[in-house]
A protein has these predicted regions:
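Conserved AMP-binding/adenylate-forming core of the ANL superfamily
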Residues: 3, 7, 24-69, 73, ...
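Conserved AMP-binding A3 loop
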Residues: 36-38, 171-212
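Structural core segment of the AMP-binding/adenylate-forming
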Residues: 53-54, 84-156, 165, 496
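Adenylate-forming
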Residues: 67, 112-121, 141, 236, ...
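AMP-binding/adenylate-forming catalytic core of the ANL superfamily
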Residues: 93, 99, 110-113, 393, ...
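Conserved pre-ATP/AMP-binding loop-to-beta segment of ANL
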Residues: 157-177, 181-182, 221-231
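Conserved AMP-binding/adenylation subdomain of ANL enzymes
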Residues: 195-235, 239-283
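Conserved AMP-binding/adenylate-forming
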Residues: 255, 313-439, 444-448, 461-462
Length: 550
């Protein structure tokens, strides 16, 4: 991957250049609500003015506890304007968890929807968020809690903050949702994040990465002039890096970010927005999003009113792969569609890309192509494993990356090691890389199953199981076994009753027999986090409880 770190600027400065160049273009759409770049910049500037008046500035942490909404992006932009660091907080967290993130980050500002007000009030009453001194509540029909101010009143009363000189070393703090341990704050300097997002933005569009602010604005103007400005629909929550980062990538190219208006995923609303705003790209996370989307497309087609998806050029799935049947179903309704599976992490990437072009037959979704700066490392020695080796190693990528984890130098040293003078990001996924760059993803080392001394990576079992036509979703875990230490157990949901042996046979047809599940636990729905990622702790608990009762 080419060096994309030459532009050493704040994201606020970049977005201001875009706003000046195209003030009347659409910046944000949520449901039927529209906001131009002029409005977006003005509202963010007024909130930044309120921040400045409250003593919020460089390095201050500004936490967001919100559903997808314009206020989310406004508060991120406003924080950037005053050189503060946005902090994402999972809106499903309970009071103690909200307090943990705010306290761990040292957040001084919390912007939140009224729907979360009771939990915020509980955390405050219990003295769990001592650093938070400014509460801004977004009005959604709930009463204002003690000590908070209405978000929109603050903006209406504030004067726009003047534009200032900023630094590419300003930071965004992204908390990982992970499936093990407490959330960790990943520190992303602005210039490093710009470099990392060059791949899904400029490079994916075949464009040179700008190296000056004028070039950023000029590139956006050229894209708009050609009629190809990106219109990015972010289906996952902005509280996760997948949606937020791709929204930022679309913004810096002068594009429009489209968000669903509802608070639960509605596939029909998504397709309405695609048609209404001529959406060009959709960001999602695996089959958890794709299955209701394809079901909605099929229902419309069967009713005699198929969707017009001529504008849709790309669907990108990060964090979970799309199954072959879902790729086929999407491609059947969108003639110009390119489908991308990307291996990424809060700590960086991409580590691999799987592209299904228009007319291609979808293949095994666990096979990707690694960019040149991606290697595998021996987990014990940290030596680079030559491409073409069958030895599994930890995926690692060099190039733009975070500064580390907030307040955790030991984990920073483990995840971002320097090897032979090169700094790598090593989030913990195991894989092999063939001579031609083909990546076979094996899964995360922390959830690797050890059965009789054999290492079994869940993802290869899950991908194989989903090839059974009646399997909707599946997650593989290891359950304790007296003789083998662990045995592979599959927790899965199906469209109809299925003989467990049929699923096991499907797996054995695709991978080594010893990797196949010894038992299967059927559930109505395989639980996934709001970002679409599988929850291995939930699956392990579910499997153990079901097997104990059988």
């Amino acid at each position: 991957m080419s060096d994309t770190g030459a532009l050493h600027e704040s994201w606020a400065t970049l977005w201001e250049a875009i706003a000046d160049a195209q003030p009347d273009a659409l910046a944000v759409v949520i449901g039927t609500q529209e906001m131009t770049w002029r409005e977006y910049d003005d509202r963010a500037a007024r909130l930044a003015g309120a921040f400045t008046a409250a003593g919020v500035g460089r390095g201050t942490k500004v936490a967001q506890l919100m559903f997808n909404c314009p206020e989310y992006m406004e508060s991120v932009y406003a924080a950037f304007k005053v050189q503060a660091s946005p902090v994402n907080v999972n809106y499903r967290y309970q009071a103690a968890e909200i307090a943990y993130v705010c306290d761990n980050a040292g957040a001084e500002v919390l912007v939140f929807h009224g729907a979360h007000a009771d939990r915020v009030a509980t955390a405050r009453a219990d003295g769990l968020m001592p650093s938070v001194r400014l509460l801004l509540q977004v009005d959604d029909g709930h009463s204002l809690i003690d000590g908070a101010r209405w978000y929109h009143d603050v903006i209406a009363e504030a004067e726009p903050a003047p534009r200032i000189d900023r630094s590419g070393d300003d930071e965004l703090l992204l908390y990982t949702g992970g499936t093990t341990g407490m959330p960790k704050g990943v520190i992303w300097p602005h210039h490093e994040l710009f470099g990392a997002l060059a791949f899904p933005g400029y490079m994916a569009a075949g464009l040179d990465v700008p190296t000056t602010i004028d070039a950023v604005a000029g590139t956006a103007a050229a894209i708009r002039g050609s009629g190809h400005s990106p219109v990015m629909l972010c289906a996952p929550p902005l509280m996760h890096g997948t949606a937020l980062f791709l929204a930022m990538s679309a913004f810096v190219m002068g594009g429009t970010v489209v968000l669903l208006g509802g608070r639960s995923f509605d596939a029909d609303e998504l397709w309405d927005l695609v048609e209404r705003y001529q959406v060009t790209q959709i960001s999602l996370v695996g089959d958890a999003f794709a299955r209701p989307m394809t079901a909605a497309l099929a229902a419309r087609a069967e009713a005699g009113s198929p969707r017009n998806l001529a504008s849709l050029q790309r669907i990108a799935s990060t964090g979970a792969t799309l199954s072959a049947d879902q790729k086929r179903a999407l491609a059947a309704h969108a003639p110009n569609l390119m489908i991308l599976d990307m291996i990424g992490a809060s700590e960086g990437g991409p580590f691999g890309v799987s592209a299904t072009m228009p007319g291609d037959e979808p293949t095994d979704t666990a096979v990707f192509t690694a960019p040149p700066n991606v290697v595998t490392l021996d987990p014990d020695t940290h030596e680079v494993i030559p491409r073409g080796s069958d030895t599994p190693g930890m995926l690692a990528v060099s190039g733009p990356m975070p500064a580390g984890y907030l307040g955790d130098p030991d984990k920073t040293a483990r995840t971002f090691p320097v090897i032979d003078g090169v700094r790598y990001t090593v989030p913990g996924d195991f894989a092999t890389i063939a001579t031609d760059g083909t990546v076979t993803l094996l899964g995360r080392g922390s959830v690797c199953i050890n059965s009789g001394g054999e290492k079994i990576y869940p993802e290869e079992v899950e991908v194989a199981a989903r090839e059974h036509p009646d399997v909707i979703d599946a997650i593989a875990v290891g359950v304790p076994h007296e003789r083998f230490g662990q045995t592979v157990t599959l927790v899965c949901s199906t469209r109809a009753p299925v003989d467990p042996d049929a699923i096991i046979d499907t797996v054995k047809e695709r991978i080594a027999h010893y990797k196949a599940p010894r038992q299967i636990v059927f559930v109505d729905e395989v639980y996934r986090a709001p970002n679409g990622k599988l929850d291995y702790r939930w699956a392990t608990d579910t499997a153990i409880a079901a097997l104990a009762g059988s």
